[in-house]
Amino acid sequence: MLVHQVNTKLCSAKQFTHLAKVVTPALSYQASSVYSANLPRLAASPRLFSTTSSAQLRDFFPVKETEHIRQTPPTWPHHGLTEKEMVDVVPGHRKPRTLGDKFAWSLVRISRWGMDKVSGLSSEQQQINKGSPTTSIVAAKPLTEAQWLSRFIFLESIAAVPGMVAGMLRHLHSLRRLKRDNGWIETLLEEAYNERMHLLTFLKMCEPGWLMKILIIGAQGVYFNAMFVAYLISPKICHRFVGYLEEEAVHTYTRSIEELERGDLPKWSDPKFQVPEIAVSYWGMPEGHRTMRDLLLYIRADEANHRGVHHTLGNLNQVEDPNPFVSDYKGDKPRPVAASRPEGFEREEVIGKEVIGKEVIEKDVIGKEVLGKQVSV
């Protein structure tokens, strides 16, 4: 009978030495690769509203590679801004004049208070100044970079809702009336697109956790439906509400810029810090002007523009008046600059008085067109 002798040793000393020489470099290479890949993300500070581990961060919306398409440019390219236009933006406030204005302003203040509470800001970090009708841009204690990003992402996720709702309803209104909308739809949809680009930019810097995602879904559902019903009831109050909301956005970004300039946000002040490529492409940020401060200046200028647009639209006839920000004026008069007027333009400034001279085309009995006299409408 054959008896097989079993070697109980795993390997001899010579074999073990040879095996170690082969395995050790491979293991060390994998370990170093994993460590180096995760090192920058591990360095990121904890994020409010985020349950995602820093080590699990990834490109939140990677570009899909296709065989033929190289890239998809923005549908609405940014119109561009000069440094002077961005620096000249100042916080402002339109004092409530009507009952609707007061209602809209109260809703914004309540929303701001609720956002501060949900964000977990301490009393020293909150901006609300009870002794002033506007929000203070200075607080006793600065926010961290993580707190700012969490706040930006949540706010921008719902900031794009009003423009889309208003644009959609005005589009349907135009179809029902079989009439032109006179430029309102394009401006409102472009605003929604612009706010979404703000969100996508910040998402390249911070991935929200599951709690933030749930809050965004809930807030969007409530906000969209509430805005939908409210705009059907009173478009004027809705535009005033969004105007006040954009005032708060200008205050928020102004405070973040000032904290950055004071050195309270060292990670964003680092000369090595670069803004996401999506921001460089969308705003056309030139070389040497791609810091976090530059990015915040661009976004604040956008919010200032929305502030002026909505306060102005809230002053107009919601059915008949054209959009003054896309219209061509008589006598080569320049278009109004929304960002330059925090409280918006009055109707008389951009449309004119209630009685306007208008040339009427009439036809005589033989069908020839005759230029009629000016009449009042």
UniProtKB/Swiss-Prot annotation:
Cofactors demanded by this protein: Fe cation
Note on cofactor: Binds 2 iron ions per subunit.
Binding site for Fe cation 1: 156, 195, 198, 303
Keyword match Membrane: yes
UniProt key word Metal-binding: yes
Keywords per UniProt: Electron transport, Iron, Membrane, Metal-binding, Mitochondrion, Mitochondrion inner membrane, Oxidoreductase, Respiratory chain, Transit peptide, Transmembrane, Transmembrane helix, Transport
Record-listed E.C. numbers: 1.-.-.-
Membrane topology recorded in Swiss-Prot or TrEMBL: Multi-pass membrane protein
Annotated localization: Mitochondrion inner membrane
Recorded family membership: Belongs to the alternative oxidase family.
Designated name of the protein: Alternative oxidase, mitochondrial
